[in-house]
């Protein structure tokens, strides 16, 4: 505690010193009738660009080239006459030329602190160690940093502080910046992949009068002008399928969903999903498309289809394993046999042996799904599609033509984590109405995650929706896999957090 108090005292002292420097600078500018921070500097070079262009040149070649550069960035270190600045691409050194710079500029540079954002213009040289630097012929303070950065050797190591102060994390930790650069490229790669295959990107409502498309507890708000309760969407599914009814045969959306549920390493109340719908296709087409898309995006972003995640290696270039839900239970269920899962009494007894609390309303399909989640899901290490989910737990999926107990639905797993959920869509309006009614009854019985009855969506289906396949892929979890990030908070710029004491 004493060490923390001392550190806080030191930080407060540094902040006070910097505020005094800022006040003096403003006073000086006011007396001169100018601005403390003129906005007239224009950068023409990034650190990485200079390294790519000039890094292989020797000192003599650089002297001959007389390459001049205008650079800008945040001061990360000061070492003798050298100042290391960091821009969006990399770091580069500035050299304080005490002989060539005006006295007033040298005095100004003396007041610069680590964390300040500065600019410099001058010729590019190479040090005796082979490092590029810009000889400062001109120098300018662009922004004064009032708070000191964390220790340069330890960075921002407190995990919670990294999440709460992501701006500092991004300054100090190159790996954090890399994660979010990869995330951006993943989303761009998915968008490119789908557009190249004829899918159209659309936007559907975030605020909905009926939150449908997933079994989840929604966030509720109130629209004052309309005087009605509205909900942040839990999924865009029902609106996207309305578009298929309207004639858009291949649509997708990459956007946020909101679910008023718990926080964990896999769950955040707002998260990014890709959802796409494909008319005149079925879930088997989705299996092939999903496998190709994940493989393609991984190779585009990482340059390889081999992914390292938390000490394990996954090969996305090989055919993904495909098992039915029933097959996976029998394969991974530690001795479970057909009699343990194929009848209601057998499945209920199995749940009791496994310590799974059983609700009276559960049917055989729900029992089987709970058994799968208990004995098989976390063992699905290699890339795996699980198919034929029970109709009871798939209220929006089309029943299988030969076995109506199951649906033409799949989920995709890697490392025991679900990344995608897709199925041949239910396009029978009467069947959909019955399933909505069953879900509404569960909601009336106290199930806060059960779906609402959406009469307008049923009406849309009554106009006729072509055979359609649809899928959702969790972007956050996919990025976790591709960046070896153990928590969803590592791949969200600003994850949900409990309010801090300060």
Swiss-Prot record:
Q: Which E.C. number(s) belong to this protein?
A: 6.1.1.6
Write down how the cofactor binds this protein: Binds 3 Mg(2+) ions per subunit.
A Pfam entry, by short name: tRNA-synt_2
- Spans through the membrane: none
- List, alphabetically, the InterPro entries matched: Aa-tRNA-synt_II, aa-tRNA-synth_II, aa-tRNA-synth_II/BPL/LPL, Lys-tRNA-ligase_II, Lys-tRNA-ligase_II_N, Lys-tRNA-synth_II_C, NA-bd_OB-fold, NA-bd_OB_tRNA
Q: Which key words are in the record?
A: Aminoacyl-tRNA synthetase, ATP-binding, Cytoplasm, Ligase, Magnesium, Metal-binding, Nucleotide-binding, Protein biosynthesis
Q: Which GO terms describe its cellular component?
A: cytosol
Sections of the chain in a coiled coil: none
- List the GO biological process terms: lysyl-tRNA aminoacylation
Q: Write out the GO MF terms.
A: ATP binding; lysine-tRNA ligase activity; magnesium ion binding; tRNA binding
Q: Which cofactor does it need?
A: Mg(2+)
Q: What is its main location?
A: cytoplasm
Positions of Mg(2+) 1 binding: 411, 418
| Record's subcellular location | Cytoplasm
Q: Which reaction does it catalyse?
A: tRNA(Lys) + L-lysine + ATP = L-lysyl-tRNA(Lys) + AMP + diphosphate
* Annotated Mg(2+) 2 binding sites: 418
Similarity-based family: Belongs to the class-II aminoacyl-tRNA synthetase family.
This protein's assembly is summarised as: Homodimer.
Q: What is this protein called?
A: Lysine--tRNA ligase
**What does the record give as the organism's lineage?**
Bacteria, Pseudomonadati, Pseudomonadota, Gammaproteobacteria, Oceanospirillales
Q: Which gene encodes it?
A: lysS
């Amino acid at each position: 505690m004493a060490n923390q108090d001392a550190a806080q005292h030191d930080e407060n002292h540094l902040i006070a010193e910097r505020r005094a420097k800022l006040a003096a600078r403003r006073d000086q500018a006011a007396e001169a009738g100018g601005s403390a921070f003129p906005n007239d500097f224009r950068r023409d070079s990034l650190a990485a660009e200079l390294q790519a262009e000039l890094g292989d040149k020797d000192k003599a070649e650089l002297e001959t080239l007389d390459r001049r550069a205008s650079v800008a960035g945040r001061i990360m270190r000061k070492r003798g006459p050298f100042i290391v600045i960091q821009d969006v691409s990399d770091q580069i050194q500035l050299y304080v030329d005490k002989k060539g710079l005006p006295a007033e500029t040298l005095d100004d540079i003396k007041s610069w602190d680590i964390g300040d954002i500065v600019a410099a213009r001058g010729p590019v040289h190479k040090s005796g160690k082979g490092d590029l630097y810009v000889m400062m012929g001109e120098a300018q303070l662009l922004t004064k940093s009032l708070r000191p950065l964390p220790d340069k050797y330890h960075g921002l190591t407190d995990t919670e502080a990294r999440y709460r102060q992501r701006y500092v994390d991004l300054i100090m930790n190159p790996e954090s910046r890399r994660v979010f650069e990869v995330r951006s490229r993943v989303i761009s790669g998915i968008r490119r992949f789908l557009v190249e295959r004829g899918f159209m990107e659309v936007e559907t409502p975030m605020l909905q009068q009926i939150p449908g498309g997933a079994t989840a507890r929604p966030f509720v708000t109130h629209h004052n002008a309309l005087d009605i309760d509205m909900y942040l969407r839990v999924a865009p599914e029902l609106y996207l399928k309305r578009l298929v009814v309207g004639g858009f045969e291949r649509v997708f959306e990459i956007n946020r969903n909101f679910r008023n549920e718990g926080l964990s390493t896999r769950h955040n109340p707002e998260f990014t999903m890709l959802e796409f719908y494909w008319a005149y296709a079925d879930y088997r087409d989705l299996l092939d498309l999903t496998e190709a898309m994940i493989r393609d995006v991984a190779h585009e972003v990482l340059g390889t289809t081999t992914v390292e995640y938390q000490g394990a290696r996954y090969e996305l270039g090989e055919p993904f394993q495909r098992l039915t839900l029933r097959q996976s239970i029998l394969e991974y269920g530690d001795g479970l046999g057909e009699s343990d899962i194929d009848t209601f009494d057998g499945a209920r007894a199995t749940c009791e042996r496994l310590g799974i609390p059983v609700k009276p309303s559960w049917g055989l399909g729900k029992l089987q799904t709970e058994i799968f989640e208990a004995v098989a899901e976390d063992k699905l290490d290699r890339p795996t599609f699980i198919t034929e989910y029970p109709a009871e737990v798939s209220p929006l999926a089309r029943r299988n033509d030969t076995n109506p107990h199951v649906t033409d639905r799949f989920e995709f797993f890697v490392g025991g984590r679900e990344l995608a959920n897709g199925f041949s869509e239910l396009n029978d309006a009467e069947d959909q109405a019955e399933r909505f009614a069953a879900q509404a009854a569960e909601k009336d019985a106290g199930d806060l995650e059960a779906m609402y009855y959406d009469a307008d969506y049923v009406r849309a289906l009554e106009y006729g929706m072509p055979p359609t396949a649809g899928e959702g892929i969790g972007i956050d979890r996919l990025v976790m896999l591709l960046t070896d990030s153990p928590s969803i908070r590592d791949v969200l710029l600003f994850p949900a957090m409990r309010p801090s004491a300060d």
